[in-house]
Every structure is written in structure tokens, then in C-alpha cells.
Design a protein with these regions (language model features):
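Alpha-helical recognition/docking segments in bacterial nutrient-uptake
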Residues: 2-111, 115, 175-178, 182
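Short, well-ordered beta-strand segments
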Residues: 6-9, 131, 208
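Short, solvent-exposed amphipathic alpha-helices that sit
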Residues: 16-30, 112-119, 139-158, 189, ...
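Short beta-strand elements in bilobed, periplasmic/extracellular small-molecule ligand-binding domains
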Residues: 28-40, 129-134, 149-169, 174-177
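Short, polar loop motifs at secondary-structure junctions
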Residues: 90-96, 162-166, 210-215
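Hydrophobic alpha-helical segments within soluble ligand-binding/sensing domains
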Residues: 92-131, 186, 211, 226-246
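An alpha-beta-alpha
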Residues: 111-153, 249-261
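Flexible loop/turn connectors
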Residues: 172-175, 181-261
């Protein structure tokens, strides 16, 4: 009963990818020999890794996060089509243009944020304003921003987008949705600006962060997040390999209520 050889091709390593990996690794329970490469959202690296490793692994598990321009996306589809469907599992992003019976466990960047915020709608309707801090370098910032705008407009919640936190935007009673990578500078700047005004998260103003992470429970006495369930995503991908049955499933996305909102 030999170990299955699995190539994990992640875009980058972060606290969320660590959760994904741990869940995948723990579920396989030693039945998979896992190799990890990072493509860094560079299409030429994806092409190179597939070239070098075709036929060497039983399964290829890939997070296809690449620039959304048509030229790059065409190359992504072409590269992924080289892997036999029965050996391919796509993670974290869904590619509707990619045909075939491969496996996929993913989040829906266009709609998930809307449903995540809807889980806190009663509270959000009472706040004077939702301030949304977007990360322009994120591949999906336009999709996520659209979902947030739609949510706010349908529920008549005043909102404004910012690309960074400045002390001037930090005000009592308002809520800040940080769409950045986990625990990066914007969250730190927000906490600092609040501290200098003696404002306490959860008591005087609210913070919601995008993407759950192991640190979320601890930071600011508990950070409220809207996030896909990365543990579920890793587990489902591993189960496909263990059972030898591939399927496509959107993972759960929810608001996890903690102290900060």
C-alpha cells in the first residue's frame, strides 16, 4: 500500500495557506508523500513546474491565483489542461472555463463577501458607516469590493473605500472592514490610530478582517472575520485523494464573531 505522491502548487505561503496545508496533511494521515512548490502568481512558474513534473505525481493540487487579464488566464487554462483530469484538484479559486471532471474546492470571490457580511447585517445596520480598506495588489479586490458595495447599497449602510488606513479615518462607532492579507500593516495602523485616540476595538468601534487565521482568536482580544473555511477546504481535497473520487464543491464562508465587532 504505497504512499500517493502529491504535488501541491500554492501561489504563496501565508497563515491561511498554512491552515489549508495543515488540514490537508492531517487528513491524509501519512498516506500521501507531499511536495510543495510556490508559483508566486507567476504564470511562467506554473508552466515550468507542470513541464518538469508531468507524469511524476499521482495528484496535482493547485491554487490557480494569477493575474486576471485574458492573456494570462488563457495560459493558465492551457497549462492545467495538460494534467489528466483524474489527477487534478483545484483549490481556493474556481475556473468555470476549465472543462472536465477534475476536483475543485473553492471560494466564490464575487459573492462570498456579500453573504459573509449578511451574517452581521443586524449589527451593521446600526453603524453610522462601514469603512472598507482594500488592497490594490490583491487579485480579487474588484470582485470583493463589488460584493461589499452591493451589500451596503441593498441594506442602506453608508460606506467608503480606502486604499490605506490614515489616522483621520479612524472614528468612534464606525466599522472597518480590512480586506488585506492577514495581520499586515493596515490592521496595525488601524490599531495604532485607535490607541492614540483611546478607542477600544469592540467597545468604541468595530473591526472585521477578511480571512480567518490561527492568530484571529488572539489579536485584539479576538478579531471578527469573514472567511472561507480553509480547514474544510484542505480536508475535502485530501478526502478526494483518499477516496479516489473527485468532485467540485464551494466551501463554507461565514462571519466568525469575536470581540472586535
Amino acid at each position: 500500500n504505497r504512499q500517493m505522491r502529491v504535488l501541491l502548487l500554492f501561489d504563496k505561503f501565508s497563515s491561511t495557506k498554512q491552515m489549508l496545508y495543515n488540514s490537508f496533511h492531517d487528513t491524509t494521515g501519512g498516506k500521501a508523500d507531499i511536495t510543495i512548490y510556490l508559483h508566486n502568481q507567476q504564470i511562467n512558474l506554473l508552466e515550468y513546474y507542470i513541464d518538469e513534473n508531468l507524469g511524476k505525481f499521482d495528484y496535482y493540487v493547485i491554487t490557480p491565483h494569477f493575474p486576471l487579464d485574458p492573456e494570462t488566464q488563457k495560459r493558465v487554462l492551457k497549462a492545467l489542461r495538460r494534467i489528466p483530469n483524474r489527477k487534478l484538484i483545484i483549490m481556493d479559486n474556481y475556473l468555470p472555463e476549465l472543462p472536465g471532471n477534475y476536483g475543485a474546492v473553492y471560494q466564490d470571490f464575487e459573492n462570498d463577501a456579500y453573504y459573509g457580511l449578511a451574517m452581521g447585517v443586524k449589527k451593521l445596520k446600526k453603524v453610522p458607516k462601514l469603512n472598507v480598506v482594500i488592497e490594490l495588489s490583491s487579485l480579487y479586490h474588484t470582485m470583493i469590493s463589488k460584493a461589499v458595495s452591493r451589500f451596503c447599497e441593498e441594506n442602506e449602510i453608508p460606506y467608503e473605500f480606502y486604499t490605506q488606513v490614515t489616522p483621520q479615518i479612524v472614528k468612534p462607532k464606525e466599522v472597518y472592514l480590512i480586506l488585506h492579507g492577514q495581520f499586515d500593516m493596515e490592521l496595525i495602523k488601524l490599531a495604532r490610530a485607535a490607541k492614540s485616540q483611546k478607542l477600544k476595538p469592540g467597545r468604541d468601534f468595530g473591526i472585521i478582517s477578511y480571512n480567518e487565521s490561527p492568530m484571529s482568536e488572539i489579536v485584539l482580544d479576538g478579531l471578527t472575520t469573514i472567511s472561507v473555511d480553509f480547514v474544510q477546504m484542505g480536508r475535502l481535497a485530501a478526502e478526494m485523494i483518499l477516496d479516489g473520487k473527485l468532485f467540485k464543491q464551494k466551501c463554507d464562508f461565514r462571519m466568525i464573531h469575536r470581540n472586535s465587532f
